[in-house]
Amino acid sequence: MAAMLTAHGHEVAFYRRTTEGVRESSVGKVAGFLSGIYSPSGVRGMREALRRERPDVVNVHNLYPFISPAALFECKKAGVPVVMTVHNFRLICPTGLFMRNGIPCETCLERGNEWSCVRYNCEHSRLKSLGYTLRNVYARWTGAYRKNVDAFACITDFQRQKLIAAGYDAQKIRVIPNFLPIPQSYRSGVGKYVAFCGRISREKGVDLILEVARRNPNIPFKLAGEVRDKELVEQIPANCELVGYLSGDALSQFYQEAAFFVMASKWYEGFPMSILEAACYGKPTIGPAHGGFTEIIGRGDSAIGKLFEPNNLDDLERQIVSLWHAPDEIARLGQMAFEKLQCEYSSEVIYKKWDSLFQELVRKH
């Protein structure tokens, strides 16, 4: 995003803290626990950055663990408007995932239910779950976000609706999706396999994809990504190939030779960029009908892929098998995906949304 703004003539300055080399040590973990709730150095650093840079607008991303939401009060004191890019669900859910035991969980949606993170030990560590909970509780009690953030930029409307349900002011919430560089055109052609690109893990629904492959030995599957769950891939069907983590030309070839992509995530995710990446190559995506997947893939005549009932193996299989045997439909959906990419997710389209928001915030201040 910084490169996009700079390309349009904006000056961009950074204030950031890194956890590199700190979180592995016991001292670092304790420091992260405490500073996530209130970080004196993070507050001081924000104050100094505001004095040094004198910005028109502050765009906040991740404040944890070494800056903390308390730093937002410094922006308020300096009279500088704040827009927060909402990458996940951390404003409501301490873990930021809306997920427990591998499936969606919205127990924390009602204000004050942050303690569910401790109750269910969502971080699989009592101390870590407590730390995550306390940061949310403290931020809510002090009003760090509600009092100091002038606009929340959600990456999906699904996120926006969840913030509203949690009591955030709807007038402060905008939807500005992610974007990526878009090619002028794409090469059409019949694909060779059903593709998945992402972490090889259960929460990504890879176990479901592998089971569909087992049931349909005549359909080839290829999965690209880092293996996070080795048990999951100990016995994979013969028609399924793990190609590992790919980048550069190898990744481009992987996308180009696929018939279509499948994302079977059991949780909502934030903004599933793989859908847009597939669209760059004119490839449709099958995804779960929840979270941001529904609005990105869409329904009806304007859809750029197919939706299946989340965590429903049989429905996922139906969608995969049906689309595999419909090359004309694959081509049509792929064309729709590329056109939607150009109309809604180009850097120019997204820049205009950001520029409009920045100008509005500056005018109001």
For each of these PLM feature ranges, what is it?
Residues 77, 90, 102-151:
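Membrane-proximal helix-turn-helix segments that form the acceptor-binding/catalytic region
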Residues 153, 178, 186-204, 210-216, ...:
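Conserved donor-binding/catalytic core segment of Leloir-type glycosyltransferases
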Residues 230-249:
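Nucleotide-activated donor-binding/catalytic signature segment of Leloir-type glycosyltransferases, i.e.
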Residues 266, 283, 287-297, 310-311:
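Short glycine-rich donor-binding/catalytic loop of glycosyltransferases
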